[in-house]
């Protein structure tokens, strides 16, 4: 397909979770065109993908100013990533810390593949900005979520595609309480409530019970951090250490 001229638009990595939903709202406040991109890689918590359309529709209907800006959604089958991964995100195994100090929820190469595919789609669609919810403040230590990684990837992608794309990571230095706060700043209590009810974070895919902070098992690291972040947000506090 012929490449279109670069426009005031962004492509957001959107999993259906809290962080990426916040990033979609962040982009909608800044760019005239916002498209979304999801990946089905055989994740254990595949229910998050089922939340994506509900979040998109809610954003359109509850925030009229954003409705015309929210463009196409793209879903990519990346089952090969799940096939080559042996992690707690792609296998039904206990979540634990590995010998290298990383949790076994780390999927090697995941964000590198996500951003590379996103860049190829953005190139074709004429979108200049890629947006991801990576951050260094969630205590996971994932190397492909680090600021240095994203900066290096931006350089590599632009060299390899002869473009001037920008990789934006608006949550990079925000803790989970500040992520809730950002949602409030972007869309008020209505956006906070949308994210609380419509998004999914739980690693094990539990979506049977709605807690104060959202759906989830309440026991996995993702649920504990989301819960702690929501509680800290309500109290005006920060999340300075990993919840137990």
Swiss-Prot record:
The keyword Ligase applies. Its cofactor is Zn(2+). It is an enzyme of class 6 (ligase). Pfam families: QueC. ATP binds at residues 14-24. GO terms for molecular function: ATP binding; ligase activity, forming carbon-nitrogen bonds; zinc ion binding. Pathway: Purine metabolism; 7-cyano-7-deazaguanine biosynthesis. Signal peptide: none annotated. Zn(2+) binds at residues 202, 217, 220, 223. Keywords: ATP-binding, Ligase, Metal-binding, Nucleotide-binding, Queuosine biosynthesis, Zinc. Its EC number is 6.3.4.20. InterPro entries: QueC (IPR018317), Rossmann-like_a/b/a_fold (IPR014729). It catalyses: 7-carboxy-7-deazaguanine + NH4(+) + ATP = 7-cyano-7-deazaguanine + ADP + phosphate + H2O + H(+). One of its GO terms (biological process) is queuosine biosynthetic process. Binds 1 zinc ion per subunit. Catalyzes the ATP-dependent conversion of 7-carboxy-7-deazaguanine (CDG) to 7-cyano-7-deazaguanine (preQ(0)). HAMAP family: QueC. Belongs to the QueC family. PANTHER family: 7-CYANO-7-DEAZAGUANINE SYNTHASE. This is 7-cyano-7-deazaguanine synthase. It comes from Burkholderia cenocepacia (strain HI2424).
